[in-house]
Design a protein with these regions (language model features):
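Catalytic Tyr-x(3-8)-Lys segment
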Residues: 190-211
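Conserved glycine-rich cofactor-binding loop
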Residues: 7, 14-15
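Rossmann-fold cofactor-recognition segment
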Residues: 49-64
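Conserved Rossmann-fold SDR core element
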Residues: 154, 163-178, 225-232
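C-terminal substrate-recognition "lid" of short-chain dehydrogenase/reductases
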Residues: 205-232
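Conserved mid-core segment of classical short-chain dehydrogenase/reductases
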Residues: 84-101, 183
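Catalytic loop of short-chain dehydrogenase/reductase
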Residues: 100-104, 108, 113, 127-165, ...
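Hydrophobic positions on the long internal alpha-helix
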Residues: 80, 110-118, 156-157, 215
């Protein structure tokens, strides 16, 4: 499937994996709109994205604002949801339940709200691609909240693929990727995470956002894929 003149909306498309996906789709001829809650982030992203890329600011945790966003955008072909604040590992003995609920607000309910709002505007043959992570398959200590979110998104993906057919619904499950996702960690801790991960997995390195963007393009363009969780982790689930 060619993306030429296809309308692609990337929620969370101003940084990290979302930005790389938006750029890759635009380079394949798509008409891309990136969305972030921060207008300044939208402006910075547009300065670095191919000409013809559009941007809008919207609070993806505000249901009414999300519905207005899609009303303004009109008909689209593909929805990509990569939005998410930097993760914080939380062991059970230090668990902050309010913070845990906050993580679900954007990463799970934000995705569900976006799909609900976008459905009336998705053209026939369109697709939805959500974002999960390998924590659902192989969690480590401190990953109870993150693993739960990833598991919820994977279940949501499969349920939506059935309910919304023939609209295709898939999700990408990255492993550890060098991206702003880890900005809540100190630089030393972050670099140690990258080194430890690279040493432990078959690929021998951590992922880059451009690696993961190719997985999203696959989900956008593969007409026979739906209900799939595409794991792109350098073999981390095998390590």
């Amino acid at each position: 499937m060619d993306l030429h003149q296809q309308r692609v909306v990337v929620l969370g498309g101003t940084s990290g994996i979302g930005f790389a996906t938006a750029k890759a789709a635009a380079c394949r001829g798509a008409e891309v709109t990136v969305v972030s809650s921060r207008p300044a982030s939208v402006d910075r992203a547009l300065a670095d994205l191919p000409p013809g890329t559009h941007g809008q600011a919207a609070d993806l945790t505000d249901t009414d604002e999300v519905h207005r966003l899609f009303q303004d955008l009109g008909s689209i072909d593909h929805l990509v949801f990569t939005a998410g604040e930097p993760l914080a590992l939380m062991s059970l003995d230090t668990l902050d339940l309010e913070k845990a609920r906050d993580f679900f607000t954007l990463r799970y309910f934000g995705a569900l709200s976006a799909v609900h709002a976008a459905i009336p505007y998705l053209r026939p043959g369109g697709s939805i691609t959500l974002t999960t992570g390998i924590a659902a398959q192989r969690p480590g200590p401190g990953w109870a909240v993150a693993a739960s979110i990833c598991g919820a998104v994977e279940s949501l993906t499969r349920a939506l693929a059935v309910e919304l057919a023939p609209i295709r619904v898939n999700a990408v499950a990255p492993g550890v990727v060098r991206s702003p996702l880890w900005d809540s960690m100190t630089q030393a801790s972050r670099e140690q995470l990258y080194r430890d991960t690279a040493a432990a997995i078959p690929a021998g390195r951590v992922g880059e956002v451009d690696d993961i963007a190719q997985a999203y393009l696959y989900c956008l363009t593969q007409p026979f894929a739906t209900g799939s969780i595409l794991t792109v982790d350098g073999g981390a689930v095998l390590a």
